[in-house]
Amino acid sequence: MSPTFYPAARHAFPEVLDLLRRFRRDQTGSYAIITALTMPALLGLVGLGSEVGLWYYNHQHLQSAADSGAISAATTYSIQGNSTGLITQAQAATATYGFVAGANNVVVTLHQPPLSGSYTSTTNAVEVIVSQPQTRLFSSLFSSSQLTISARAVAVGNGGLGCVLSLNTTASGATVIKGTSAVNLSGCSLMDNSSNSSALTLNGGGTLSALSVNVVGNVSGTSNITTTLGINTGATPASDPYADSSYPSFSGCDKHNFSSKKTETINPGVYCGGMSLNAGAHVTLNPGVYYLDQGSLSVNGGATLSGTGVTLVFTSSTGNNYATASVNGGATINLTPPTNGSTAGIVFFGDRNMPVGTGFSFECGASQVLGGALYLPRGAVSFAGGADTTTACTQLVADTITFSGNSNFAINCAGYGTKPIGSRLAKLVE
């Protein structure tokens, strides 16, 4: 608001007004002297404030570069399983932010695992530090020492892509390896979403070899586990990769209580009461979706089941007695999934409405070539007594999983239509 002056006041107090005018004229010189004396300091403070702001701005950019470098290096470690070239990856990432190692005195340092912080014992954690000396301007009036700004970031690789995933979030022994079973996950990881202190349990002489083991809870029996990227407890739960997948609706019955002891080829459709293959059966499935409405897929010793581009759906039109699967000793299975369509990548598809813990068994001695995903999200799956999955691409996703026989998995899944379990992308943790 502007000041207001009143004419009456000027006439009433002329002496006072004249005195004030003379005082103002007398102070003009003093103001000039004070201003001259303080102006350098004021300008210095303004300049110093601007310089500190520039340091803060540079630190923010250094931090972005360090974050990117750590994520890039940790992701590379997750993919290749060793430390080769990690510093090169980190430096390439920081360079995209204008911080080129060796240029303008920029230094990029990498430690794997970190030398400080909460992840010094985490094998797949990578620490990146980016530093650069700053040129002093106004601050040189107060100090001549070198000022270096640094930014630090730590990223943890997620252990690579999974091929075995237990979805149960609370169970003890959501994944169990028992007996003398040897479970080999070639180039892929085991993931267990249970927060239980014994989420993954190895009993007896059972062994596990994997790219990594990622468990939300904890592990019982770590001495029998061999990994490339480490055992990660307290992990972030893995998402259900097929949560958005669905199978087409169905109705009626094309076959009732199908049973075979001979060589034959059958077509997609609804098989009410399931399928039973006995010794002497050599059944080939034409491509498509096979609905097992109640009953069981039973493949007994001496029987062979094969098919390319097939999905077997385990369901129930009544909401009761959901279909299951039982592959017994001496049976042979060779199945691969469709590569497109609503069930792409899925060779076994369990209805999400079936009771939790519905049993699916793959018994000892079975020669199994199961390509794609065994997606049984409510199932209690047992791989038992020497079951051997030799295909290059096998995923097992179930509520709980028990291995009591030798089992092999790999995820060379190009051309199978599968979806990845987990991600190779690392995440920032510090």
Label for each model-derived stretch:
Residues 247-259, 263-264, 415-430:
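Short, low-complexity, Pro/Ser/Thr/Gly-rich segments in the mature regions of secreted, periplasmic
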Residues 122-126, 149-151, 186-188, 267, ...:
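Envelope-exposed proteins and targeting segments
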Residues 164, 170-178, 192, 198-202, ...:
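Beta-strand-rich extracellular passenger or scaffold domains
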Residues 393-430:
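Short linear sequence signals and composition-biased patches located at protein termini or domain-edge surfaces
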Residues 36-50, 64:
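Alpha-helical hydrophobic helix detector
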Residues 15-39:
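Glycine-centered recognition micro-motifs in short, flexible terminal segments and loops
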